[in-house]
């Protein structure tokens, strides 16, 4: 029989409950008020009193309201039908909620995440008599562009023998597709879906590998200078309006992955609506179909209850780990982890815990680390390799990278793509600072070349600061040429037009080709009589390179521009 209790105190979305019976941490419970059941989660136990965070608005909850505990942790349902869906943080399908409740979400309405009536064409890959363990494949269904493997549930701890398996055909997620038997002779029915607690990492794999293979984003500044590896982690901190959301959307569109999961936790509703409107209309460059076919969106806007933000981050990473277990490459984009940290700060304050820096909880670093540590590249039991790459945007107030959430994130990620107000105001997009950003991963271009090019950016910035004080006349022609070359590298290679059909996504082959051209310009010595002549020449080169960026790779126009560029360089270079 489930444990019962009653409300003895309410403080915002924190409810204190007096319980009669046993309760466990993170257990889900329902507060019964005004004819509705409001979902909540146990976050602290003190004797016979329990503190729970409610995932809904707590308006109307009063002392004496009855509470029922479920004896279950907060879980997600895993199975075919997750892709193309838009969920809230508790995995309620928002399109279904809209049909049922209208434009405004009602409290206490919880729907099943997966469609129980839809039939999936199941093709078996195992047979009666096979010995299986948790995470092994029984067969697959086609979900959008993905071979969705039907697996033995991850919570099964022993080895089992398949005693029954259905023939190929159409089945719903609740229909029995196999029966497995353990060593004691007990039989277990297997369906296409099962539940898994969101705060428990999925560990049904043979070993974890060190991320080394680059995950191509087709954004030049990232792939060349600050690469991300498959199974790696990266963060995108930046002030408001610097282009974090656009950069994440471009990455999700062009990244070399099989499935994209977007966790919009605490973002403005307008940005989430933009994502929901754009994604179904965008074409996946790899398949020619809608981008939504390989995307799952979990959104908790800033207007939704605070507690559900935390749940949305864990829901997203659990779904990512589930698809990783199929041997797929997953990209999870969390936008923005600052809002999630603010939700933790709010709960910590209500629990009257000793605050850390800027009133964030003292355990902020360990919570952020435990989230990013769930990224990784793994070898599955059958030898396949799957990965989850995690990218979190951070919204520090005023673009201050010294604040606690950014600092806690920097300690655990493998790449840092810092967006700056200075670059976004100058309309240099993506506004990733080439001087402040870094990456620990290997990119698509030789590291010696990129370090040489980056040294030009550093020198160019120093000369630019000097020119602000003494003017152009106060520096030598050689220094002025270094400054012009650094500006050429910035405008022709680091900057990219996300709204141009050709320049929005640049293949690794084209990146190598264009970088070699720019690298040769940086290495070449030129001689000019004065600064005006130098500026005119570099501007001519810049225009030529920009035109090449907007031309199809190696077509007639591209080749013509490249030939003209070569003649210009040969005309002015010092032999």
Curated annotation (Swiss-Prot):
Record-stated family: Belongs to the ATPase alpha/beta chains family.
EC number: 7.1.2.2
Name this polypeptide is given: V-type ATP synthase alpha chain
One Gene Ontology term of the molecular function aspect: ATP binding
InterPro entries found in the cross-reference section: ATP-synt_VA_C, ATP-synth_a_Xtn, ATP_synth_asu-like_sf, ATPase_F1/V1/A1_a/bsu_N, ATPase_F1/V1/A1_a/bsu_N_sf, ATPase_F1/V1/A1_a/bsu_nucl-bd, ATPase_F1/V1_b/a_C, P-loop_NTPase
SUPFAM superfamilies noted in UniProt: N-terminal domain of alpha and beta subunits of F1 ATP synthase, P-loop containing nucleoside triphosphate hydrolases
Pfam families: ATP-synt_ab (PF00006), ATP-synt_ab_N (PF02874), ATP-synt_ab_Xtn (PF16886), ATP-synt_VA_C (PF22919)
GO cellular component term, pick one: proton-transporting ATP synthase complex
Top-level taxon: Bacteria
NCBIfam families: PRK04192.1
Its job: Produces ATP from ADP in the presence of a proton gradient across the membrane. The V-type alpha chain is a catalytic subunit.
GO biological process per UniProt: proton motive force-driven plasma membrane ATP synthesis
Membrane spanning residue stretches: none
Encoding gene per record: atpA
Keywords of this entry: ATP synthesis, ATP-binding, Hydrogen ion transport, Ion transport, Nucleotide-binding, Translocase, Transport
Cystine bridges: none
Chemical reaction(s) catalysed: ATP + H2O + 4 H(+)(in) = ADP + phosphate + 5 H(+)(out)
Enzyme class: translocase
Ligand binding (ATP): 238-245
């Amino acid at each position: 029989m489930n444990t019962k209790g009653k409300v003895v105190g309410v403080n915002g979305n924190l409810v204190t409950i007096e319980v009669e019976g046993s309760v466990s941490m993170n257990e889900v419970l329902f507060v019964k008020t005004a004819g509705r059941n409001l979902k909540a989660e146990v976050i602290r136990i003190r004797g016979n009193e329990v503190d729970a965070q409610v995932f809904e608005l707590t308006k109307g909850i009063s002392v004496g309201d009855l509470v029922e505990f479920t004896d279950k942790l907060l879980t997600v349902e895993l199975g075919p039908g997750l892709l193309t869906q838009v969920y809230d943080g508790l995995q309620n399908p928002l399109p279904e909620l809209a049909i049922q409740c209208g434009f405004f979400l009602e409290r206490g309405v919880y729907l099943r995440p997966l469609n129980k009536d839809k039939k999936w064409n199941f093709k078996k890959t195992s047979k009666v008599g096979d010995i299986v363990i948790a995470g092994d494949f029984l067969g697959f269904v086609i979900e959008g562009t993905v071979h969705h493997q039907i697996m033995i549930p991850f919570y099964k701890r022993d080895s089992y023998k398949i005693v029954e398996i259905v023939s190929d055909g159409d089945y719903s997620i609740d229909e029995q597709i196999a029966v497995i038997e353990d060593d004691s002779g007990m039989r277990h029915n297997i369906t296409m879906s099962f539940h898994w607690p969101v705060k428990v990492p999925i560990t049904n794999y043979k070993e974890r590998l060190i991320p080394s293979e680059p995950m191509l984003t087709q954004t030049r500044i990232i792939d060349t200078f600050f690469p991300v590896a498959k199974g790696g982690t990266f963060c995108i901190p930046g002030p408001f309006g610097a282009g974090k959301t656009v950069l994440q959307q471009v990455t999700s569109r062009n990244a070399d992955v099989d499935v994209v999961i977007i966790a919009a936790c605490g973002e403005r509703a307008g940005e989430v609506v933009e994502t929901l409107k754009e994604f179904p209309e965008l074409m996946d460059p790899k398949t020619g179909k809608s981008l939504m076919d390989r995307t799952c969106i979990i959104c908790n806007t800033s207007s939704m209850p605070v507690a559900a933000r935390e749940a949305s981050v864990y829901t997203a990473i659990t779904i990512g780990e589930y698809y990783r277990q199929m041997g797929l490459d997953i990209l999870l984009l969390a936008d923005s982890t600052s809002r999630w940290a603010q939700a933790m700060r709010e709960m910590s304050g209500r629990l009257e815990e000793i605050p850390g820096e800027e009133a964030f909880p003292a355990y902020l670093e360990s919570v952020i680390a435990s989230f990013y540590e769930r990224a990784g590249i793994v070898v599955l039991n059958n030898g396949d390799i799957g990965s989850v790459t995690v990218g979190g945007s951070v919204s520090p107030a005023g673009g201050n990278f010294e604040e606690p959430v950014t600092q806690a994130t920097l300690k655990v990620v493998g790449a840092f793509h810092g967006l700056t107000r200075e670059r976004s105001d100058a309309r240099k997009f993506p506004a990733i600072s080439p001087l402040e950003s870094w990456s620990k991963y290997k990119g698509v271009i030789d590291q010696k070349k990129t370090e040489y090019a980056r040294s030009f950016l550093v020198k160019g910035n120093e000369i630019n600061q000097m020119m602000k004080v003494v003017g152009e006349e106060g520096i030598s022609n050689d220094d002025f040429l270094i400054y012009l070359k650094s500006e050429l590298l910035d405008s022709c290679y680091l900057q990219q037009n996300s709204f141009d059909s050709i320049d929005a996504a640049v293949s690794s082959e084209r990146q190598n080709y264009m970088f070699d051209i720019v690298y040769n310009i940086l290495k070449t010595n030129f001689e000019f009589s004065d600064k005006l002549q130098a500026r005119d020449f570099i501007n001519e080169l810049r225009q030529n390179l920009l035109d090449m960026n907007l031309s199809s790779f190696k077509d007639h126009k591209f080749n013509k521009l490249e030939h003209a560029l070569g003649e210009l360089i040969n005309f002015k270079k010092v032999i």
